[in-house]
Design a protein with these regions (language model features):
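Residue-level signature of catalytic and energy-coupling elements of molecular machines
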Residues: 1, 20, 113, 148, ...
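Nucleotide/phosphate-binding catalytic cleft detector across ATP-hydrolyzing
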Residues: 1-145, 163-165, 174, 188, ...
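N-terminal phosphate-binding loop and adjacent alpha-helix
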Residues: 1-10, 178-182, 293-299
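Glycine-rich phosphate-binding loops at beta-strand->alpha-helix junctions
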Residues: 22, 200-203, 255-279
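A short acidic Gly-Thr/Ser loop motif
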Residues: 22-24, 146-153, 159-162, 171-175, ...
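Conserved phosphate-binding/catalytic loops in two-lobed NTP-binding clefts
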Residues: 46, 50, 279-300
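Short, solvent-exposed amphipathic alpha-helical segments in soluble enzyme
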Residues: 114, 139, 275-281
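A conserved active-site cap/scaffold subdomain adjacent to cofactor or substrate pockets
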Residues: 171-187
């Protein structure tokens, strides 16, 4: 409630309802196919498409809720169509990508806001809101992956033909780099400062750079330069290996013509763009920074 009061003071307006973003490790996607056999050949109607959507949402998933649905395509005969309405057929398959999360996630959020006396207007899937803010229509259409390097997690979203094709949350982020530096008997606050000031995501072995024996901050602590570089680069490589594994699992690793769009606090490390280019098979990498989230959607 104190946050709401601060916002109301800043906006000079009262807040009746709030939008709540859902992200983090509980999010993932699963695929589902719904089939309808028709008694005779007839034109596919919007009502039939809606029925497929409803059946998909009713699929039981133990301890999980379907938060959003991204229709992938519809198989009519031998053709895969984004919009089959009006096409004659006696058989249709609807293919869906369901974004799911543990049931306890929404339950806990509902409980917290109810106790605070704040009404929830709607839930927003944070990775989808981020995609609306940073991706261009061309990137979504041509095929791209959006990587959000957070403190505790790294979120991977894959788009092709303006449709979300895959979403996964990796339990690794910038704070893991900080913790690795802490293992050298350095306090967390100092480790974070060393990371931000001297951290390098990629060291080009072909370049002869002036050697620095130690990195230090305000005389408080120091660390051997090569050791800090090894620590940061090793963890970045691990995160990028996990990112690329998700891209391969999506089945779109060779279909992303627009490459990768990288954002998030941990993406600000020096040479992150180069690291991404070297550690993945994508030629195009765009760093997207300081983007504001939007609530507009492209998901049913």
């Amino acid at each position: 409630t104190s946050i709401i009061k601060k916002l109301e003071s800043t906006l000079k307006a009262s807040i009746g309802k709030v939008y709540v973003g859902i992200g983090g490790q509980s999010l993932r996607t699963i695929r589902n196919t719904e089939v309808r056999h028709l008694e005779e050949e007839t034109k596919i109607s919007q009502e039939l498409i809606d029925s497929l959507m409803d059946s998909n949402r009713e699929v039981p998933i133990i301890d999980q809720d379907i938060l959003e649905v991204a229709p992938q395509e519809y198989k009519v005969g031998i053709n895969l169509l984004a919009d089959p309405v009006g096409v004659p057929s006696d058989h249709i398959e609807g293919r869906f990508l369901n974004i799911i999360a543990r049931s306890s996630v929404k339950q806990n959020i509902d409980k917290c806001f109810h106790q605070a006396g704040i009404e929830i207007a709607d839930y927003v899937i944070s990775p989808l809101a981020l995609a609306n803010a940073v991706l261009t229509n061309s990137e979504r259409r041509s095929g791209c992956m959006l990587i959000d390097f957070g403190a505790d997690t790294t979120t991977v979203s894959v788009y092709k033909n303006n449709i979300l094709r895959h979403l996964a949350v990796i339990p690794l982020g910038g704070s893991n780099i900080t913790k690795d530096i802490c293992s050298q008997q350095i306090e967390e606050e100092d480790a974070e400062e060393l990371k931000l000031k001297y951290g390098n995501a990629y060291i080009d072995p072909s370049k002869d750079e002036e050697e620095t024996p130690n990195y230090a901050i305000d005389g408080k602590c120091s660390i051997e330069a090569h050791l800090l570089e090894d620590i940061v680069e090793a963890r970045v490589n691990e995160i990028l290996a996990n990112v690329w594994n998700q891209i391969v699992l999506s089945g779109y690793d060779d279909k992303l013509l627009a490459g990768a769009i990288v954002t998030g606090g941990a993406a600000n490390l020096k040479n992150m763009e180069e690291a991404f280019s070297k550690r993945t098979k994508l030629e195009k990498v765009r760093m997207a920074k300081d983007s504001q989230l939007s609530l507009k959607g492209g998901i049913e």
